Each structure stands twice: as structure tokens, then as C-alpha cells.
Amino acid sequence: MTPSDESKALVRRLVEIVNARELEALDEVARGQIAEGARAWIGPFRDSFPDFRMEVVDVIAEGEKVVGHFKCSGTHQGEWRGNPPSGRRFEDVDEIYIFRVEDGRLASATAVVEDNLTRLRQLGIEP
């Protein structure tokens, strides 16, 4: 496996971990601060959207950088951003992240696109 393939595999494994709610496994793929940050948002977000899923659309790697494009979906079943549960779903919401790999694990993650406007509209929440 090439270094680029290994980096792409890290991002795909990250998505598996998020989808399976295996937050303790984040340390396999991410360095300390990134793993802690992911736990900090995944837990509460999963409380609001228990069936939240990420689908990998594409993963591109070059050098230490990896770009992941994902489609996300979930049903609003818990309070989120002060909004009570609506029971409505968001589907196919685009998210694009740039990751940096260091010593075989994700060392940084930058959200380039998180289409929260589409997510809010599908949930019936005024932006």
C-alpha cells in the first residue's frame, strides 16, 4: 500500500468509527487533540441525530494532505443548537474536509464545506 493509500484508508476508517459510534477507537486514526475534538462533537451530535451516517463520496491524497468528500444524513430526534427534536431528516448534506497526516495518524482536520444551510432547511429550521 502506498503512503497515499494509507492516508486515504485513515479517513475511510474515521468514517467507519463515526458511523459505528466507536468513539474510543478514534485514537487508532487520530492524534490526541484531533481525537478529543472529534469526541467532543460526535457524542452530542449523535444525541441529536442518533441515526447519523456519513457516506464517503471521494477521498484524494497527496503527500501529507487528504481531502474527504462526504454525504451525511440523520433524523432530528434530540435537541440541536437550541432547537427541539422535529423528527425530520436531512439527507445528502455535503461535507468536505482537508486532513493532514503525521506519523500515520490524522493530525489536523479543517472543514472546508459543511452545508449547514441545506441541513437546516431540510430540518425546517430557520437559519
Q: Where are the regions a protein language model picked out?
A:
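C-terminal and inter-domain tail/linker signature
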Residues: 1-127
